[in-house]
Amino acid sequence: MSIQWFPGHMHKARLEIQATLPRVDIVIEVLDARIPYSSENPMLAEMRGDKLCLKVLAKADLADPLATEDWLDHYNLLEGVQGCAVSTEDIPTIRRIKLLVERMVDRRDGKMINAMILGVPNVGKSTIINVLANRKIAKTGNTPAVTQQQQRVNISDNVTLLDTPGVLWPNLHNANSGYRLALIGSIKDLSLIHISSPRD
């Protein structure tokens, strides 16, 4: 099976992310806690380079807590990376994201911290943004591609958050990852294309 769903707005978003990243202090990458590996976009990781990164495992209330702890331990061993887990209905865990960003960047010159939030479609970025901003800024939904353009949001006096559209990579050749992304709603059903092998 090969999954090919890379609509025009995703290509545009990728170019905009590449252009904006040099001006960003930290990247907040939102992953689905149920499938952290499959929901991690390798294209975004390559673009991020050695930029500070906060890995947020969203929807942790739906995931295996022991597996979540293992993933957090893994992230916290990486250079310039920290992990945290948040639950959709647990507002305080989401608000911790701002504190972690401030701690990781450690900005002492009084300038604003510029953070960029990234992730594949439908992992919960918009819900997190709305909580951090204390108001409804981003549209939420159970279908992918709700957010289709960048928007800048002040979430505190010293942190600005740049919201980006959910972006997949052009071709997903790992069948298991593709199925998992489809199950959590990151890919539209019509995007599933079965490619027969010579033995079919």
What are these model-derived regions, one by one?
Residues M1-V27, A33-L54, A60, L66, ...:
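Helix-rich effector regions associated with P-loop NTPase G domains
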Residues D32, Y75, I128, D163-T164:
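Residue-level signature of catalytic and energy-coupling elements of molecular machines
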Residues L54-K55, M116:
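A structural signal for isolated positions on well-ordered beta-strands in alpha/beta enzyme cores
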Residues A63-L118:
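Canonical P-loop GTPase G-domain recognition
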Residues M112, R135, Q150:
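Short coil/loop residues immediately preceding or within conserved phosphate-binding loops
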Residues A115-N134:
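Glycine-rich phosphate-binding P-loop
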Residues N134-N142:
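Post-Walker A helix-loop "phosphate-sensing" segment adjacent to the P-loop in P-loop NTPases
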